[in-house]
Every structure is written in structure tokens, then in C-alpha cells.
Amino acid sequence: MIWNSKTLSAVLGITISNSISCNEVQFNSKDVKKGNLFIALQGNRDGHDYVLDAIDKGAAAVIISKRVEINDKDKIILVDDCFEALQKMALYKRENSKAKFIAITGSVGKTSTKEALKVLLQHDFLVFASRGNFNNKLGMLINLASMADDTEYAIFELGMNHKGEIRELVQILKPNIAMITNISEAHLEFFNSLEEIAEAKCEIFANFSKNDIAVINADTNCYNKILSILKNLSITDIHSFGRSAKTSAELILYENLGEQVYLKYKINKKVLDVTIPFIPRHFTENYTGVLLIIDILGKDIEIAANHLANISPTKGRGEIINIQNCRVICDYYNASPQSMKAALEYLKQVPAENKTAIIGDMLELGENSKRLHEKLVQYILDAACSKVYLVGVNTKYINDLLPAKIAKKYFKNVDELITHITDLFEGNELILIKGSRGVKLDKIVDYYK
């Protein structure tokens, strides 16, 4: 139980006479499960139009700001402004929580890093991790409002595509530990340089107090820029991770054993050896930072490292599934130049006689789009793909540069691909599907499954 009548009355400044007991807060009726608290927010659609649907799905209570005709009046919580009510609930949770708050940002790797840290901590502690990649202001408020009072560690990912967004988030979240996974060209459409992206990401440290801790990827672009910003903020408790022996945490060795990988880490002078099911190198590099945080928290990193084997990619983020006779790497949730390079290197690492790449546009790159798409050609060639399907306006630049020896086809959109390629999964192939979410490459998997 996360909310009851007494607490809601106090937080919202209203009187709730009926008995209410509910758990997670939802604003999308599609996500409502039995016992949830539904809040009718006004966005592109009016949440009040979905109150009945939420109740049908088992909502224990609904927060509304205008009258809705429903039979079960005891479930109604009437407020003046639903979004203001949500903010009050989120602030109450943060201000009254005894949890250690950990915030993660970066151009890529936020969600996978957050989920990895959750897996390593949840075996011994009560852990709350923000749901999915819901990392904007609304997402943070909904997640905070859904946090149990006895949470010991709260892990949030924070996203942005404009300056000032993360600063606003941390004023509410007040993280005790903040991590930057990397700085790359994602969202470059909205910035003039990588340095500007770094500055925006460093807003995660804007609300730091004396004892708060910064964790930084030393291999990232703009590392020195980040250190300079931290210095100007008078932040001194800084820990780095990466491939260098000079860092606090180092990935010493990544060895591909076929079905498995052997990893050797050094975390604050402690060496760890672990063999886990095969995952691409870029995931294990992020694990370096995760293990570093575990060590900073004073936990047993040897026990934590043994749980690395329990981490599996989430849907659309490198998950491998079988469709007909093919193994399919589903990495279509999002794409930036760095994550696209990592995905193609992953394809290169996995042994297979026949490899196909389905590449969708990388969005939000602005005037750099043509150049950054063209840079992918060499990575596609290195992956030894026998077939390449290109989807979207910007992948036309790739199509123009790929040699004739590769069987290639270009499509303006994903529906065109689905219509024209009817035998996509009939061969015995390894297929990578990678592109920005806006290209909707997930429709390929949904169509064939």
C-alpha cells in the first residue's frame, strides 16, 4: 500500500471521508492494474475521458478535477487541479523518504544502467527504479508518487533534449549520487555542440549538497569539460570509471567466449572475475559504473558481480528473440550515432553465417544528420552483412554509399518494407533491427510475430 485516505487528505489539503487504499499512480488508463490510483491529467487527451476505463481495470481510486458520472462514488477524489495534486504527492514522497537517491543521465545507456543497478541491489534491499524510460518531468513525478515509504534505494533516469530540463528535475529529486554514462550526438538538433550537451547533462549536479557524489564515465566525450563544471560547482567527491587504470573503476578485460563472455573488473583496487551469458561490450562498460556505485555504497561488490548474470536486455533494447528460423536482435527503441555503432559492433561479434541489418533513421541530429548517417557505412561493412535494409529519409545517405556487393534495399518508411519484403525471416539468419523510435521499426516484429 502506497497511499491511503489519511495521507492523501493531508498531502492534498482536502477531506477524504471514504476508506481508500491504493498502490502505484497511473495517468494512462491502459497501464492501470488492480489497486492502482488513476489521476486524470490533461494532455493531448483529457484523462477524465478514461476514468471509467481505469475503474473497469481495477483502479482503487481516481483523482479528478471535474465531475465524471461513475457508479462507485467512493472511489472519487475531487481536486482543483490534477497536475498540482500530482506535484504535491511527488514532493511529499521525496521530502519524507529516507531512501538514498541515485540519478542517471547520459546520451545513451540510461535505462540499461538503471536496470542493471536495480538488479544488483534488489537482492538485499528494497529498491525502487523509475519505470521504463519515462524520464521527463511528468515521468519523474509519477514515479516519485508511486514510491513505497520503506524504499531504501531509489534509482531514477533523467532525460532531456533541451537546456534547463534536468536542472528542473533535480530541484525536486535531489539525488545523493548522480552518474553520467556518456556524452554523444543524441539530440544534437537542439544544441550547437557536444560541449553544450555536456553542460545540459551536468545540470544533474546543480542541486548537490556537500556530501553528494558524482560518478563519471572517463572515456566519454567532453570528460574534461565535465570535470571543469564540477570544479566550478565546488563538487569534490568525484569517482570515474572506464578503460583506463587511472580511473576508480576499470573494465580490464572483455573476452568473447561464444555463448558467454569473461569479464575482469578492477573496482577501487579490488579485482573481480566473472563469466556471464554473452552480452555486447558496451553493456559491460556501463556495468563498470554500476559496480563502482555498489562499492561507493559500501556493499559487497563480489556478491553484486555474481548477479550480473541475472541482467537481461529489456524489450527493444538489445533483446534477442527467435522469429521463424532467425535470431533477431531487437534494438529499435532508440538510436544515436554512438548506440548505432555499438549495435553494429555487437552484430559483428555474434557468430553467424548470414547477417542482415535493418537500419532506421537516427533522429534529432539536425544539420549533422547526413554526415553522421554516412559514418555508419564503415560499421555496416565491418559487421559483414550480406543484406541491408534501410528505412527512413536519412538512411538514403547510407544507401548511396554502400557497395554493390551488398544486397541492399531502401524504403521510405517501415510500412513500405513490410509490404515489399515478404520473406524477411525465412532464411537462417542473424538480423539486427536498429533505429530511432520515431521510425517505428518495432512494427516489423509485431507484424511477423
From Swiss-Prot:
Alphabetized InterPro entries for the sequence: Mur-like_cat_sf, Mur_ligase_C, Mur_ligase_C_dom_sf, Mur_ligase_cen, Mur_ligase_N, MurCDEF_CellWall_CoF430Synth, MurE/MurF_N, UDP-N-AcMur_synth
EC number: 6.3.2.10
Molecular function, one GO term: ATP binding
EC primary class: ligase
GO annotations of cellular component type: cytoplasm
Residues annotated to bind ATP: G106, S107, V108, G109, K110, T111, S112
Annotated catalysed reactions: D-alanyl-D-alanine + UDP-N-acetyl-alpha-D-muramoyl-L-alanyl-gamma-D-glutamyl-meso-2,6-diaminopimelate + ATP = UDP-N-acetyl-alpha-D-muramoyl-L-alanyl-gamma-D-glutamyl-meso-2,6-diaminopimeloyl-D-alanyl-D-alanine + ADP + phosphate + H(+)
Name the UniProt record assigns to this protein: UDP-N-acetylmuramoyl-tripeptide--D-alanyl-D-alanine ligase
